[in-house]
UniProtKB/Swiss-Prot annotation:
Keyword Iron included in the entry's annotation: no
Example GO molecular function: structural constituent of ribosome
GO biological process, one term: translation
Organism in which the protein naturally occurs: Arabidopsis thaliana
PROSITE patterns attached to this UniProt entry: RIBOSOMAL_L36E
Gene3D superfamilies found in the cross-reference section: 60S ribosomal protein L36
UniProt-listed Pfam families: Ribosomal_L36e (PF01158)
Span list, region Disordered: 79-112
Protein name, as recorded: Large ribosomal subunit protein eL36y
A GO CC term attached to the entry: cytosolic ribosome
Keywords noted in UniProt: Ribonucleoprotein, Ribosomal protein
Length: 112
């Protein structure tokens, strides 16, 4: 359907009807369904930092290091279930690898 047009106040024609101002309604709870809250994102990042990577994530990282992107995708798909999740995990692991190579990772720095 098309969006309703402003009523003209006339009782004949396409836009017939009484002129009213639209009420601004609060967003429905369903509109935020599936969105991750800031707190949840923070907690997940904290847990990742403390716990480290899962064994399958380490394997994906190793495969990406040697340039076996397709094999890394297959491993991720086998563990995560869907192609979409696997692609996202592969991208996440490759970004972690890039950060480590650029010196952004804390594990690569040596202490004296």
């Amino acid at each position: 359907m098309t969006t309703p047009q402003v009523k003209t106040g006339l009782f004949v024609g396409l836009n017939k009807g009484h002129v009213v101002t639209r009420r601004e309604l609060a967003p429905r709870p369903r509109s935020r369904k599936g969105k991750t809250s800031k707190r949840t994102i923070f907690i997940r990042n904290l847990i990742k930092e403390v716990a480290g990577q899962a064994p399958y994530e380490k394997r994906i990282t190793e495969l990406l290091k040697v340039g076996k992107d397709k094999r890394a995708l297959k491993v991720a798909k086998r563990k995560l279930g869907t192609h979409k999740r696997a692609k996202r995990k592969r991208e996440e692991m490759s970004s972690v690898l890039r950060k480590m190579r650029s010196g952004g990772g804390g594990a690569t720095e040596k202490k004296k």
